[in-house]
Amino acid sequence: MSKETFPHLEALRDLMRSKHIDAVIIPGTDPHQSEYPSEHWKFRDYVSGFTGSNGTAVVTLDDAGLWTDSRYFLQAAEQLEGSGFTLRKENIPGEPTVLEWLGEVLDEDAVVGVDGRLFSLIEANRIELFCAQNGFMFAPDFRAAEAIWTDRPARPMNPAFVHDEALAGEDVDSKISRVVDALDAADADGLLITALDEIAWLLNLRGSDVDYTPVVIAFAYVSEDERVLFIDSEKVTFEVKDHLKKYGVKIKDYDDIEKFLGKISSTATVMVDPNRVSDALGQAMICNKTYMASPVIALKGVKNECQIAGFRQAMLYDGAAMVRMMMWLEQNVANGITEMDVDRRLQQERAAYASNRGDSFHMIAGYKDHGAIVHYEATDESAYTLAPEGLLLIDTGGQYLEGTTDITRTISLGNPTAAEKHDYTLILKGHLALARAVFPKGTMGVQLDVLARGPLWNEGMTYLHGTGHGVGHFLGCHEGPQSIRMEANPTPLELGMVTSNEPGIYKTGEYGIRTENLLLCVPACSNEEWGEFYKFESLTLFPYDTTLMDMDMLSREEVKQINDYHAMVCERLRPLLSADEAQWLEQKCKSI
């Protein structure tokens, strides 16, 4: 047990013994159910050493497991070595879930502890019900991080800033009015908002408290008569204070949220999103509660014309930055550059634009077999040195004041094999099929998912991640309410939604291939008999790798689609490029 996190595991067990806790469940999130929590809340990482964005650690007095999905199997296997944790694979036949495993290993009357601040009401209720059914005790206030994490990073105190209404396309009064309309329709008096991206969108605020997502850590409460933001005072600049005052938003201390909720009249009804509000906050409320999805999610998911224009501008910046990075990569691939150098170079190119605010997630630059690790994150220690051969998968995104980007390209660094070209073309065919889809109003993502997977399925292959996720406007790179995946999601695709299109194939020990563009849902046609039909507009601006295409596998329709896309990329990016850069791009986009 040589790994440095192992002493942390033993310290946790010592605390468990002293508190008579037999098992503890540790998620990888924060009190806001954030995809990317601040360092202050990464207790799971501290105990286990696993750093993936999805994963749950479970510790008993004599065993420990880390549950994660297929995106992180290879990463987790490496990071958990010597940690005292066993990798447990989610959604794999024969593998027990967290609760199934606890049911097998715990004795009757065992006590299962959680930090109720980190579990949504639905999750906590599920664990509590499981405990009751199995004769276990449920302890929802086991706060281990405060007790054993001696060098815990402080809660971030970065200043918030106002997101310009000219970029947001709607002022705070208008947004809150629409939320209040949703409350009236649900016979609710108020709405508790805990998700950071919802608060940022609703109040036109942004921040830098969380890596990759420009949000500020806060809570909010909204009703017809009251607007309250719970935030650390250190984050409130004069500009932010004036902005909130203009829209009648009161400011209270971040830590006063439970006290405030406890004072809401017992006759009032507050709308609570059980998938986002924590168990700790839910238990603090004595008022009536109506459980339903926050109306902010749906409102935020449909972009207005200003936001769409911003997305298009961000794609121009990002496409030009990609061109410059790729030119540099081609010129230096034989000079000993690494996966990390690719990451740094693209950050440098993006930063040349004044509105850039960093990346929208940690770049995945996976060379050769590293590309088969779906959410691989290179470090200076793990990074491969590139050479003029093999495949390089680059999945990256930028944050700009105008919008958020997310793009994946797989490129050949030289001499692609027949197998690489075959697999690349299969992925491209699925990607193209989804991009050219026309579908009736009311269609859900699950109904379109097969378009992207079909070419792989025809050859007995698949991928285990989703095909598409929503993307925020200068917010989270991954958001809802829509998705395109095999699992059912009742949310239909609506006009103005921005969704990713990213099929992939991963061959362990060999390579990974993924191709991703962002798609905007736009009108296609309508008629009296059949109603409205929608289609997609590809927002992302960067060419596919034509050297990896097996032309015998492409139809005339697909060839035309590729050529039309490449012509658009050239036309739109050319004004941002130098003569040499434009010439490079035109070569990459020449007709096939």
Task: Name what the model sees in each region.
Residues 1-592:
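Active-site neighborhoods and metal-handling regions in enzymes and metal-associated proteins
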